[in-house]
Amino acid sequence: MSRAVIIRLALIGLIVMVSGCSLAPPKGFPTADDVDLDRFMGNWYVIAHIPPSKTKNAYNEIERYTRGDDADTINVKFTYREGGFDGQQKTMRPWATVLDDPSNALWAMHFYYVLRLQYVISYVSPDYDTTIIARDKKDFVWIMARTPKLDDATYQSLVDRVKDIGYDTSELRKVPQQPLSERDDL
């Protein structure tokens, strides 16, 4: 067997092994108590994040959730502009599976049919206007809202929640968001 084949097989094995790991957060990790999935559906503007490297220079980031064909599947459309408001629009279409029926706060986000990542709704406001999506590895976090801009007090309260989860909030990046009237990507 050639070295390239061995490396490919090892990578496939690693992906399968990682995607099969438990996605449940450890006991005590903050999760929203009872997420009403129908109310959670719709557009969420990413206000701030500790992003994956792919979106570290994103503008106008939006996650759109819609219910899938079965009760536990969520269709996701993630869009952003690369490098500026006039940058190339990028779109990703992962899907999510709801893993915990009682709270609906733990999802597995599926990418490319082989990769599953933990997605924890750690907080959603009572009016479903703001949310925090976290991971117990504390590698990524998203502060999102139903509008592209938050007032300073609301934003700071969400940053404080992120800090309480255990994240280094100095790593948060505010995502530039244009007013809705200036956008052509909705």
What role is predicted for each listed range?
Residues 1, 18-21:
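Intrinsically disordered, low-complexity segments enriched in Ser/Pro/Gly/Ala and basic residues
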Residues 1-10:
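Bacterial N-terminal signal peptides that target proteins for export
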Residues 9-19:
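Bacterial N-terminal signal peptides
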Residues 21-186:
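A beta-rich soluble binding module of mature secreted/lumenal proteins
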